[in-house]
């Protein structure tokens, strides 16, 4: 029997396959398979930045960018100093807060979190200092043990805000706690952490950072990794002056 050969284009029936569109989507591997891949075919170049509003701690600007094909577009950007989110684990319970969020016009159940303060020299507060401060201000507790879990962009489509996530254990009430900041109205909620995770899995918690934190907590519990790593404790009142100066 003669050896079989692969069919040539002239042997195939039907129309030839359409060539790939030069401006169409390309499918590339991600994860470890992306090692060594170039980003140049995806990169946008900023050719102009225009600030349209400077707020207390955020700046709004409109950028003109040039895409990989040389076409120009506008991008609306929110500059943000970054933020922290804390998972306060009190035995088998987690501490959360309920507060009104004007953009969504409703009360939201969340993990304690807050924006990094501006420093006197124009810099930004270190996340490792901001996390204990926010925990103290929003819950009235301090933690004996801290573990930084990771960080993530909250909405990279329009803001550079980078959220730093922490696990806080060994909680103790602050002796001199006087409640949250004067412009914050919060309810402190304590519930079994497994119940909070269940609410997240059922779609009853819709805050993104809280979903990330609770599902991360569940993954740690599955692996028996809930023990924290001791770090220097920071008094909850530290850097409060920086916040008032910003306000």
Regions found by a protein language model. Name each.
Residues 29-31, 38-47, 107, 148, ...:
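Nudix hydrolase/Nudix homology domain
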Residues 41, 78, 85-133, 175, ...:
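Conserved Nudix-box catalytic region and its N-terminal flanking loop in Nudix hydrolases
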Residues 48-85, 90, 99:
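Acidic, metal-coordinating catalytic segment for phosphate/diphosphate chemistry
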Residues 1-29:
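Compositionally biased, low-complexity flexible segments
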Residues 62-64, 88, 167-169, 190-192:
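Short, well-ordered beta-strand micro-motif
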Residues 81, 89, 101-102, 110-116, ...:
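Active-site segment of metal-dependent pyrophosphate-handling enzymes
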Residues 72-73, 173-177:
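A short, acidic/glycine-rich surface segment
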């Amino acid at each position: 029997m003669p050896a079989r050969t692969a069919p040539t284009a002239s042997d195939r029936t039907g129309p030839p396959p359409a060539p790939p569109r030069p401006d169409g989507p390309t499918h590339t591997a991600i994860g470890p398979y992306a090692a060594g891949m170039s980003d140049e075919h995806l990169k946008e170049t900023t050719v102009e930045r225009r600030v349209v509003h400077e707020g207390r701690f955020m700046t709004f600007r409109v950028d003109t960018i040039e895409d990989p094909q040389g076409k120009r577009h506008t991008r609306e950007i929110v500059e943000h100093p970054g933020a922290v989110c804390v998972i306060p684990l009190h035995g088998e319970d987690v501490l959360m807060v309920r507060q009104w969020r004007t953009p969504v016009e409703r009360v939201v159940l969340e993990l304690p979190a807050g924006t990094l303060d501006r420093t006197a020299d124009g810099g930004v507060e270190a996340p490792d200092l901001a996390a204990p401060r926010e925990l103290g201000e929003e819950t009235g507790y301090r933690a004996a043990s801290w573990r930084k879990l990771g960080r993530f962009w909250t909405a990279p489509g329009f803001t550079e805000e980078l959220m730093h996530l922490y696990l806080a254990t060994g909680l103790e009430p602050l002796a001199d706690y006087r409640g949250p900041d004067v412009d914050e109205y919060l309810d402190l909620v304590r519930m079994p952490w497994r119940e909070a995770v269940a609410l997240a899995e059922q779609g009853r918690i819709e805050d993104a950072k809280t979903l990330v934190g609770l599902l991360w907590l569940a993954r740690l519990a599955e692996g028996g990794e809930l023990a924290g790593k001791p770090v220097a404790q920071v008094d909850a009142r530290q850097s409060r002056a920086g916040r008032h100066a910003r306000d």
